[in-house]
């Protein structure tokens, strides 16, 4: 199979979908790997390293896309890439289609087969290809939140850990999944006063045991969220409904009631965000103000730490990429139900229910395509 690895062109996106180790694995199995010139530089991987691993380097994105039976990416295609999508090609990347109807329509029109990292789901309902990026985004959230809390950044001027004799910042984490727990880990490590909310009390028991009393757990409902958010210096939104648009849990009116200079970091922004006033921002302009509060809504947070996140991502995507290359998409999906759940679009049909619901497009059951 001919595998294409284009350079990521989203704003300040420095990750790459395949490392030299991955290229070596695929080429040693008899596949051809085509990497766009400079694709790895943001992650400090040179073209020479790919060449040494058996890949071929091509100068232009058009050439790379044209060569590939399968395209490996990190982020969803953006508008300038839509014309490169074509029937008979398999695209394996993060898609987050519930929050992006134009992309969904472009994929449907192209006839391509699109498999989304974020909807691959194991029998225990965990999301193996989303988890490492949730870990990275979760651990980044208190870091960017702390920076945004500084007065020159527009924040309250609060040090997360306080100092002896001065109270620490109050950090509220909404959502006790992978991102939320990783956010709480770093916030606790900074010395902040941390509260975490989740609707699942069993999950809160696990978190309570894990942190041994170093944070407070709270059963999540609209009243509990309102009380916690009003008192918070930093709110981290980490709510995920697999494949679907995130629920809006913090209203505009509630933000107006918050302390001036408080900060809200929305990790759920790539699924539409979990604060009412959230809208996607970039690493170039990460924040904006709402009612004297600072919103940080960067949709590709892990892109800021590519040396970490490229390797974290490819560690988990490579086995699936190998299966797709070795068997072809149809056989690979029939052999692995978890990977089959990753299929979002095939030959003009939308096979993911939550995406169809969020975008108002027609749903074709997965079984009819496999």
Specify the residue positions occupied by each region the protein language model found.
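Rossmann-like adenosine-cofactor binding region
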Residues: 209-292
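Glycine/serine-rich phosphate-binding loop and adjoining beta1-alpha1 elements at the start
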Residues: 2, 8, 79-170, 298-300
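Hydrophobic beta-strand scaffold residues
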Residues: 33, 57, 91, 114-115, ...
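An N-terminal-biased, well-structured beta-alpha scaffold segment characteristic
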Residues: 2-110
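Adenosine-phosphate binding glycine-rich loop
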Residues: 118-159, 269, 274-370
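Short glycine-/small-residue-rich Rossmann-like dinucleotide-binding loops
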Residues: 69, 75-76, 95-96, 221, ...
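Glycine-rich phosphate/diphosphate-binding loop of Rossmann-like nucleotide-binding domains
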Residues: 6-45, 152-237, 287
